UniProtKB/Swiss-Prot annotation, chain A:
Name of the protein in its database record: ER lumen protein-retaining receptor 1-B
Site (Important for recycling of cargo proteins with the sequence motif K-D-E-L from the Golgi to the endoplasmic reticulum): D193
Region named Important for recycling of cargo proteins with the sequence motif K-D-E-L from the Golgi to the endoplasmic reticulum: 204-207
Keywords: Cytoplasmic vesicle, Endoplasmic reticulum, ER-Golgi transport, Golgi apparatus, Membrane, Protein transport, Receptor, Transmembrane, Transmembrane helix, Transport
Keyword Cytoplasm: no
Intervals, Cytoplasmic compartment: 25-32, 80-92, 136-149, 200-212
Transmembrane segments: 5-24, 33-52, 59-79, 93-110, 117-135, 150-168, 179-199
Function: Receptor for the C-terminal sequence motif K-D-E-L that is present on endoplasmic reticulum resident proteins and that mediates their recycling from the Golgi back to the endoplasmic reticulum.
Cellular component GO terms held in the UniProt record: cis-Golgi network; COPI-coated vesicle membrane; endoplasmic reticulum; endoplasmic reticulum membrane; endoplasmic reticulum-Golgi intermediate compartment membrane; Golgi membrane
BP GO annotations: protein retention in ER lumen; protein transport; retrograde vesicle-mediated transport, Golgi to endoplasmic reticulum
Length: 212, 10
């Protein structure tokens, strides 16, 4: 464990908590893409199948349980509990264009042609594009609530910190995983536009508005 | 080939 990975995990966890609290407290999922949350639930499910078979540490297991539980809770709130506030008309990204290519790619490019490894690879590829429906929705509605932009910032920063974690691990642990690194780079690049707006607008107290 | 060491990341 290194500081970048730890801060990355904390950032990821806080993004998940921010979103849960936003929906639960405001009893509304307005402006939130249910499709992205569905994709995240798939990402965690396919990545943590070894949750019960491969014990790494208490920290690792507990974080995985929290991620999986909270992602399902978020999906449940959006599509069930508060579905009346779900803005389906603006959440129109075709997720099959994300799931099918990443699934095919995980069969073609992976470290090991075994079910667990292919599912892990699929989850890595899917996670790198899972935020697209949410970013698409923000661009369609033309703006996002401030709390939603904090959620997106924390979520984007987590994988950016993981990039530093991989530099660190390459340097000091001779550890190197090209699949995770390339997907992490793609994921971070997708946030660049949002990072720019967040830093130039939200941090100055303005509302986040994308050029529609 | 990456060993199982990798699976220590979330």
């Amino acid at each position: 464990m290194n500081i970048f990975r730890f801060l990355g995990d904390i950032s990821h966890l806080s993004a998940i908590i921010i979103l849960l609290l936003k929906i639960w407290k405001s009893r509304s999922c307005a402006g939130i893409s249910g499709k992205s949350q569905l994709l995240f639930a798939i990402v965690f499910t396919t990545r943590y199948l070894d949750l019960f078979t491969n014990f790494i540490s208490f920290y690792n297991t507990s974080m995985k349980v929290v991620y999986v539980a909270s992602s399902y809770a978020t999906v449940w709130m959006i599509y069930s509990k508060f579905k009346a506030t779900y803005d389906g008309n603006h959440d129109t990204f075709r997720v099959e264009f994300l799931i099918v290519p990443t699934a095919i790619l995980s069969f073609l490019v992976n470290h090991d042609f075994t079910p667990l490894e292919i599912l892990w690879t699929f989850s890595i590829y899917l996670e790198s594009v899972a935020i697209l429906p949410q970013l698409f929705m923000v661009s369609k509605t033309g703006e996002a609530e401030t709390i939603t932009s904090h959620y997106l910032f924390a979520l984007g920063i987590y994988r950016t910190l993981y990039l530093f974690n991989w530099i660190w691990r390459y340097q000091f642990e001779e550890f190197f995983d090209l699949i995770a690194i390339v997907a992490g780079l793609v994921q971070t690049v997708l946030y660049c536009d949002f990072f720019y707006l967040y830093i130039t607008k939200v941090l100055k107290g303005k509302k986040l508005s994308l050029p529609a | 080939k990456r060993g199982n060491c990798h699976k220590d990341e979330l």
